[in-house]
Design a protein with these regions (language model features):
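STAS-like cytosolic regulatory interaction modules
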Residues: 1-54, 58, 64-110
């Protein structure tokens, strides 16, 4: 499956749209995209997992590391994962990632 991390700015928020499988092989691509976004010191960064089809422990670890990096740079990091994305919601819940970084079920960008 094709993996893609697409940066965007929506309503003043830096957004990384993650498409495909976030796993051991693709987590480094997300890490690089997060570093690039944090290098410009956004006040907030949303990692949009709406189109993420699979998440393993390596991908979840990368999300937790991104949260730590964001805190260190003064950026508020949030994950966006709608309830319809059951496979990713399940992993986020099992690993209690919501205790590390807020997980939004929907977002309105203004």
């Amino acid at each position: 499956m094709l993996f893609e991390v697409e940066p965007a700015t929506v309503g003043g928020h830096a957004v990384l749209r993650v498409r495909g499988e976030l796993d051991l092989l693709t987590a480094p691509q997300l890490a690089q995209a997060v570093q690039t976004q944090l290098s410009v010191s956004p006040s907030s960064l949303i990692i949009d997992l709406t189109d993420t089809t699979f998440l393993d422990s390596s991908g979840a670890r990368q999300l937790a590391l991104a949260a730590r990096q964001a805190r260190g740079s003064g950026t508020v990091l949030q994950l966006l994962c709608p309830p319809g994305n059951k496979p990713v919601q399940l992993v986020l819940g099992l690993l209690e990632l919501g205790k590390v970084v807020p997980v939004l079920e929907s977002a309105t960008f203004s």
